[in-house]
A protein has these predicted regions:
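Signature of the SF2 helicase/ATPase Hel1-core->accessory helical subdomain module
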Residues: 1-52, 61, 206-271
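Conserved C-terminal RecA-like helicase domain
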Residues: 52-201
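An amphipathic alpha-helix/rod signature
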Residues: 72, 271-272
Length: 272
């Protein structure tokens, strides 16, 4: 991050009162974090020698989705069954990457890939996962037409799943509906037919979004800046019910570099 100020203290000097991540957890205002640093790449190379392209490959993406679909049952409270499961966000580095994950997940559910949703998961939650993608589409972006074509398909899938009627002309309304569905603060979202399990994002929803039933953040990208890491982590650790004990973070790239980045971020924002 170079010499840029990373904390409020560095930017503005002494604060009248500090209330840190550590204090909030200690006071029981929020839950603690459990971070699981995973890696899909088996290689004799040192971590820093592994090329970025290794994490672009379809096999890596399938491993990530297998982990989400079949190896996160406890984090997502899936054994509790219909209506009781938690939700997750998958964050990736770019819109094309988010689109690729969306398409691959559809392909898995269509039975076209080696990864399947396990029978054990289906026993608890037959329609898992219900998912979508959300990002802001700007008409000024160069690739905007391609983004909009994909988002049109996403909205059609979403409308079919939830009986809504969104179109590209109402992207704001769609994004608001995704927010509300993920937040589950209205009674109608207590019913399984109105619930989402997973939302794929780049940066949207990673700051300021409050959804107590969101338990897990899956990260398939390089470590973010310290303040962005803490903000993103903090989507997961809102107090919800007596089964949710932690906010779960699962990373899939460069585990050593990620651990260093997280340790640094927690040190910066917890007074050590």
């Amino acid at each position: 991050v170079g010499d840029l100020a990373q904390t409020t203290h560095q930017q503005y000097g002494d604060r009248l009162h500090e209330y840190t991540v550590k204090e909030a957890i200690h006071d029981g205002a929020v839950l603690g974090f459990k971070v699981d640093y995973r890696n899909t790449i088996i290689s004799d190379l040192l971590e820093e020698e592994i090329p970025d392209q290794a994490y672009e490959d379809k096999e890596h993406m399938l491993e990530v989705l297998d982990a989400i679909l079949n190896k996160s049952q406890q984090q997502l409270n899936i054994p509790k069954g219909v209506g009781k499961s938690y939700e997750a966000i998958l964050t990736v580095k770019s819109i094309p990457r988010a689109q690729a994950y969306y398409n691959l997940l559809k392909s898995i559910l269509a039975g076209k890939e080696r990864v399947k949703v396990s029978e054990r998961v289906k026993r608890h939650l037959p329609d898992f996962p219900k998912f979508t993608i959300t990002y802001s589409v700007s008409e000024n972006e160069e690739e905007s037409i391609g983004y909009q074509d994909h988002m049109k398909q996403v909205m059609e899938d979403y409308n079919q799943e939830f009986g809504t009627h969104f179109s590209l002309a109402d992207l704001r309304g769609f994004n608001t509906d995704v927010n509300n569905r993920l937040a589950r603060k209205q009674d109608k979202y207590l019913y399984r037919n109105e619930q989402l399990d997973l939302v794929i994002v780049v940066d949207r929803l990673l700051t300021g979004f409050d959804a107590p039933c969101l338990s897990t953040l899956f990260i398939d990208r390089k470590p973010m800046r310290p303040q962005d890491l803490i903000q993103a982590f903090s989507r997961t650790n809102r107090i919800f019910d007596d089964k949710k004990h932690f906010g779960h973070i699962i990373t899939f790239q460069r585990p050593q570099a990620f651990k260093e980045a997280v340790d640094n971020a927690l040190k910066l924002y917890s007074n050590g």
